[in-house]
């Protein structure tokens, strides 16, 4: 079979807008993209390997330049043919939803993988391992999926005119956007529309997923993130609509928020995070909300879990906690709602369905900085920044570390150092490595497992740093004082 005929088969299989009668038409569409010389190009039975063959042929035929951006733009164009139009996708999704939410999401997820929008091969490169801690098994990932930028594309982007369209990577305007050297190709991207709080929102999957069925729910309007009562209402509405998914929001302040504060959005998916498995340590009473169970979660960060079958009462209770926290100051533990009139408090909320009940976890956040901790008082401190210095956002709050790609090679050098072998270990790891060398015996047989455990302990410390009420006696007494204010 040829690469062209194989891809025609993929298009007909995935896109109900085409049948085998369209084979000649589709062949000519493909030849226009990759060059007539590719007509008899031998194919591969695997659709993504077959895609690679066509892209390589297009480059050899002079249809695209030799750059990463050009290859990705063509990949998306070739897979766009295998993807139903946005209106058709939405019709099919909501038709399938009638048979059950899971039927619809399973179909949309499978399509988003098959059409290469979800970068399955890149995601498979990520390093993932569990780490036992006093808070349960944390999930450690070293994120290798996002490709390094091609120097040619960086140079081209520097000279390209800035259009400002699409406004950001989360905008509805990305749907079908061809892409350019400084903006990802999105021709094969599709977004499900739905109403949330009387406004149009979109639902899509993340192309570089950090966990199973990593979904993004985004406001149709490009407006900044905000945490208020409508946030809790929206999150509970989403888990009512998609009960097999959790959904949460990043905080709406710098340092404690995510990397995208300019566009209102939530993240969710079908994954049970370590925080969701963590037990309640202490029950808490929320004034005026007798039908809401509340408690402090056994977790390195400061989390109040609210549970109720009554979503309206749960929303009101969550808003009460948020408002009290937003005004709460305790100088004895460096917790300050305002400094010079500037607000520092917000929450990272996470919603899920558990049987007939709703759960809302509210993670208390404070984004102050100080001379001692210029990156953030409640942010990874200097001594753990050799492993993690970036913001602690929603996914990490829940117990899944997203560590930078540099660590794969850097930790390999640390392992050599621990084994007494020649190495090029970075100086920033030396203090930590010397502590590990003094405390444990290191052999070629145990070095990998012990290194993973050590990284897990550092991540637990990172989360403790981000916790506003520390796990020691002073911190827990301060947490109890806050809970009494509720």
Swiss-Prot record:
Q: Which Pfam families match?
A: GalP_UDP_tr_C (PF02744), GalP_UDP_transf (PF01087)
| Stated name of the protein | Galactose-1-phosphate uridylyltransferase
Q: In which pathway does it act?
A: Carbohydrate metabolism; galactose metabolism
Mind listing the GO molecular function terms for this protein?
Answer: UDP-glucose:hexose-1-phosphate uridylyltransferase activity
Output the GO biological process annotations, alphabetical, semicolon-separated. galactose metabolic process
| Underlying gene | galT
Query: What's any one GO cellular component for it?
Result: cytoplasm
Q: Which reaction does it catalyse?
A: alpha-D-galactose 1-phosphate + UDP-alpha-D-glucose = alpha-D-glucose 1-phosphate + UDP-alpha-D-galactose
Q: Which organism is it from?
A: Lacticaseibacillus casei (strain BL23) (Lactobacillus casei)
Location of this chain's protein in the cell: Cytoplasm
Q: Does the keyword Cell membrane apply?
A: no
Enzyme Commission numbers on file? 2.7.7.12
Coiled-coil regions listed in the entry = none
The family annotation for this protein states: Belongs to the galactose-1-phosphate uridylyltransferase type 2 family.
Fetch the InterPro entries from UniProt. Answer: GalP_uridyl_Trfase_II, GalP_uridyl_Trfase_II_CS, GalP_Utransf_C, GalP_Utransf_N
Q: Which UniProt keywords apply?
A: Carbohydrate metabolism, Cytoplasm, Galactose metabolism, Nucleotidyltransferase, Transferase
């Amino acid at each position: 079979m040829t690469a062209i005929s194989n891809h025609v088969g993929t298009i007909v299989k995935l896109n109900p807008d085409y049948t085998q009668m369209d084979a000649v038409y589709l062949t000519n569409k493909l030849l226009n993209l990759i060059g007539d010389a590719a007509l008899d190009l031998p194919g591969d039975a695997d659709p993504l390997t077959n895609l690679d063959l066509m892209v390589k042929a297009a480059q050899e035929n002079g249809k695209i330049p030799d750059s990463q951006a050009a290859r990705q733009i063509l990949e998306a164009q070739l897979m766009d043919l295998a993807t139903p139009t946005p209106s058709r996708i939405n019709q099919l999704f909501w038709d399938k939803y009638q048979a059950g939410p899971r039927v619809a999401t399973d179909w949309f997820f499978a399509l988003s993988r098959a059409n290469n929008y979800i970068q399955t091969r890149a995601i498979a490169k990520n390093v993932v391992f569990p780490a036992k801690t006093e808070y349960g098994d944390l999930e450690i990932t070293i994120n290798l999926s996002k490709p390094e930028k091609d120097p040619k594309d960086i140079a081209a982007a520097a000279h390209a005119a800035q259009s400002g369209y699409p406004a950001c990577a989360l905008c509805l305007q990305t749907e079908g956007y061809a892409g350019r050297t400084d903006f990802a190709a999105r021709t094969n991207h599709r977004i499900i529309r739905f109403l949330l709080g009387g406004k149009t929102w979109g639902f899509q999957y993340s192309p570089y997923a950090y966990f199973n069925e990593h979904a993004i729910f985004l406001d149709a309007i490009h407006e900044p993130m905000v945490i208020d009562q409508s946030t809790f209402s929206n999150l509970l509405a989403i888990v009512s609509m998609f009960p097999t998914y959790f959904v949460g929001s990043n905080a709406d302040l710098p340092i404690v928020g995510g990397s995208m504060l300019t566009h209102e959005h939530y993240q969710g998916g079908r994954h049970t995070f370590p925080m969701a498995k963590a037990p309640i340590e202490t029950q808490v009473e929320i004034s005026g909300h007798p039908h809401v169970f509340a408690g402090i979660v056994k977790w390195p960060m400061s989390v109040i879990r609210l549970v109720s079958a009554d979503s309206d009462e749960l929303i009101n209770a969550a808003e009460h906690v948020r408002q009290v926290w937003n005004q709460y100051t305790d100088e004895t533990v460096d917790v300050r709602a305002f400094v010079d009139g500037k607000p520092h408090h917000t929450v990272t909320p996470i919603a899920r369905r558990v049987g007939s009940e709703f759960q809302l976890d509210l993670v208390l956040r404070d984004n102050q900085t100080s001379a001692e901790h210029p990156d953030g008082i409640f942010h990874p401190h200097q001594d753990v920044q050799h492993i993690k210095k970036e913001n602690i956002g929603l996914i990490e709050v829940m117990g899944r570390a997203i560590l930078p790609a540099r660590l794969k090679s850097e930790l390999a050098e640390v392992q050599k150092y621990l084994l007494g072998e020649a190495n090029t270990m970075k100086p920033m790891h030396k203090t930590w490595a010397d502590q590990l060398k003094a405390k444990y015996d290191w052999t070629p047989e145990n070095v990998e497992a012990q290194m993973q455990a050590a990284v897990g302990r550092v991540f637990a410390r990172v989360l403790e740093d981000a916790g506003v009420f520390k796990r020691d006696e002073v911190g827990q007494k301060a947490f109890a004082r806050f809970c009494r204010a509720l």
